[in-house]
Amino acid sequence: HTLTSALLTVAATLFGACNKGYVPDGPTGGEGKIKLQFGASDLVQHDTRGIATPAENTVNTVDVVFFRGQNKEAITPNSGGAPVGSFHFEATTVGDWVNNDPTTQTVYIPAKASDVNGTTAVTLINLPASVRARLAVGATDEITTVDQLTKAVSQTLATVEDLTTPLLMTGQTNVTFTNPATQDNKIDVNVKRAVSRLDVVLYYDWDKLIPNQQRGLYTFLQFPSKTFVGANADITGRVDGAKTQVADLTAQPAPLTATDPVPTSELPSVYINEYDISAKTASTDPAPYVLLELPAILGDGNPLNGIFPPPAGGDFSTTPVKSYYKVILPRKIERNCRYVLHAHVVGPGSPTADQAVVLQFTLTVRPWIETNVPGFDGTTHENI
């Protein structure tokens, strides 16, 4: 009974199986078929309202691994040969698709239904090649358990900006067939991106700021450094980004449309690993944050001149001072969602980074799809 894999519509280059020795249109001789269908409607670029970029929808490779309990199940392909530790698919072999047509979204994996029945199917999209190599039976440092796979994928980032496209996507499901001999058995797997996307929009409400004359600086700090296959709560490691200049003032594309007629800047989108520290204290488990260093010209006679150190030359009316702010992220970030923070700078910051003024913001949480993810309704929430 041949295992097949069916993807929902993908707004990216589709992939085909690289396993050989079987007929793309399906087996002959009356054998059954199993469809492995990815619940990946979030990869569909529905229309112009879609909030994911083509790069975020990209599917270059797919790897399917079967586990029985905690242990990897080596599967003997129908096409012959030794048992394999995983089934691998790529975007370049369209001839392996049903009817030689990738739009069918179905590809056959040469495995018997009876061999995979009762296992857990783990699907990994855009898996790093170094991890894939360790899935092979007999590989050096072979991955043989779920825990080992989790640790292998949980790579530590060197900087926040290391999380780039194509994005890792994962999903798993229990394989339960009432009758493995039945034609067209199907496995449904809900696949999600393993990370979320963060956008920060700055509103320069305070009239002493000069974003049209001199751009400020921002730094992503204390972000979680590990990406996990399954859901993750704790922040087990942290990483910082580089101090970077804020972009020029610019028009904002939907859904980042400005609501106030004030100068705005949008920080570059950044991908962030999920976490949940909502039940912990801020003193022991602080939330990640964005540090802002924004130039402001205070002017002569401003009471703030006694708080901020004199700028170069001592002229508060012509030379800007550095004003520091913090945008503290929510204490829970869930994978496969897009978080848009609208932060308003309504007054002076601090003259020092360690005492940076915390900005309030409105937070919009959107699934990376046009349909809802449970727990997120796409409405706006106030950070207080």
Residue spans for each PLM region:
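Sec-dependent bacterial lipoprotein signal peptides
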Residues: 1-16
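Bacterial Sec-dependent N-terminal signal peptides
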Residues: 13-40, 200, 336, 384
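Intrinsic-disorder/low-complexity, polar/charged segments enriched in Ser/Thr/Lys/Arg/Asp/Glu/Gln
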Residues: 31-35, 104-106, 184-186, 197, ...
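Short glycine/proline- and aromatic-enriched beta-strand/turn motifs that initiate or cap beta-hairpins
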Residues: 41-45
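Tryptophan-paired
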Residues: 49-138, 197-201, 205-337, 373-384
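Structured interaction patches on ligand/partner-binding surfaces of diverse proteins
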Residues: 94, 130-185, 309-341, 346
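Short, solvent-exposed beta-strand/turn "edge" segments of beta-rich domains on protein surfaces
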Residues: 188-193
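Acidic, serine/threonine- and proline-rich intrinsically disordered appendage/tail regions
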Residues: 329-384
